[in-house]
């Protein structure tokens, strides 16, 4: 019978979020008999094929890497079955696992999901947590089932959201917490606890983030816009237009100074601070980036754009 560190584990993950759990498994000496990650994708201006971060790490450690387009084909499922995994660990893999795959490992498929399930099921739970204005973020370690993040949960862990948290900052914290939870659960094999069924009446979903979501609607509140700045950093970013050019807001804070600004109206305040009106309160822009330029502080931007005071953004 398999015990800790003798377990044969197939790891499935693709982005930065998945690196920390994989590193932790390697540090504990687990037998990673295969790493599944998404195919290389074109990236950058040259559109050259770029490997997922997990592939790079796996190859550095001499692990076998597999990049199928899908796991729905019987031949892919048969190959995975030949690896004879005791456990499959999933961390932001990005491909759907059919029931035939879920049935392969002896102790099931464990999924590290960075939200407090059943809240924020779906593809981008960290961004959803920031958009929701939650005080707490969290990780759920669940047994994967055929439904979208509907499987029973072994454990949950919470962390307070800080004002400076962006999606990558918060995701890094949750990846570490999730890795610790994973190691704790693996240490209990073969006597795994009974996972708790989710309350589907409390479920919420958040799908893929699109570029269009980054466009600022100044008819919303400063609080909501600032949440989007943190949730959509670094991609797609939050942006508006100024002089027919895209203006990205890299960092901002909601204020309530009573300046009487109309939505999208800019006020250079105290000579070097930039306030923009919204449906409720002012948005203070801390850092920004004009199309074709490097990012800079609001003070530096104002010095180079003498006509910024009084303009309306996004028109």
Swiss-Prot record:
Top-level taxon: Bacteria
MF (Gene Ontology): methionyl-tRNA formyltransferase activity
Transmembrane segments: none
Record GO cellular component, one term: cytosol
E.C. code: 2.1.2.9
Residues the record lists as binding (6S)-5,6,7,8-tetrahydrofolate: 115-118
Alphabetical keyword list: Protein biosynthesis, Transferase
Signal peptide: none
UniProt enzyme class: transferase
CDD domains: FMT_core_Met-tRNA-FMT_N, Met_tRNA_FMT_C
Function: Attaches a formyl group to the free amino group of methionyl-tRNA(fMet). The formyl group appears to play a dual role in the initiator identity of N-formylmethionyl-tRNA by promoting its recognition by IF2 and preventing the misappropriation of this tRNA by the elongation apparatus.
NCBIfam families registered for this protein in UniProt: fmt
Identification of the protein by name: Methionyl-tRNA formyltransferase
Organism: Dehalococcoides mccartyi (strain ATCC BAA-2100 / JCM 16839 / KCTC 5957 / BAV1)
Lineage: Bacteria, Bacillati, Chloroflexota, Dehalococcoidia, Dehalococcoidales
């Amino acid at each position: 019978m398999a015990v800790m560190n003798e377990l044969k584990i197939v790891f499935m993950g693709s982005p930065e979020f998945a690196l920390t759990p994989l590193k932790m498994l390697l540090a504990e000496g687990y037998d990673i008999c295969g790493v599944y990650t998404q195919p290389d994708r074109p990236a950058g201006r040259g559109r050259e094929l770029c490997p997922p971060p997990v592939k790079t790490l796996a190859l550095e450690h001499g692990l076998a890497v597999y990049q199928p387009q899908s796991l729905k084909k019987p031949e892919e499922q048969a190959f995975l079955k030949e690896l004879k995994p005791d456990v499959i660990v999933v961390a932001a893999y990005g491909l759907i696992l059919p029931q035939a795959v879920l049935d392969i490992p002896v102790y099931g498929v464990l999924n590290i999901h960075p939200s407090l399930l059943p809240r924020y099921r779906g593809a981008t739970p960290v961004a959803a947590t920031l958009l929701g204005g939650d005080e707490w973020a969290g990780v759920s370690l669940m047994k994967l089932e055929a439904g979208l993040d509907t499987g029973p949960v072994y454990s949950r862990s919470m962390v307070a959201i800080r004002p400076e948290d962006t999606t990558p900052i918060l995701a890094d914290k949750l990846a570490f917490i999730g890795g610790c939870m994973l190691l704790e659960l693996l240490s209990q094999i073969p006597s795994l606890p009974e996972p708790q069924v989710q309350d589907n009446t409390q479920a919420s979903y958040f799908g893929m983030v699109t570029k269009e979501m980054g466009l600022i609607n100044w008819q919303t509140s400063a609080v909501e816009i600032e949440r989007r700045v943190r949730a959509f950093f670094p991609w797609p970013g939050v942006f508006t237009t100024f002089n027919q050019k895209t203006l990205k807001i890299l960092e901002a804070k909601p204020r309530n100074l009573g300046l009487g600004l109309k939505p999208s109206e800019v006020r250079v305040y105290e000579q070097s601070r930039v306030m923009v009106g919204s449906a409720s309160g002012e948005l203070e822009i801390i850092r920004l980036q004009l199309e074709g330029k490097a990012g800079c502080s609001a003070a530096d931007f104002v010095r180079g754009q003498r006509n910024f005071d009084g303009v309306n953004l996004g028109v």
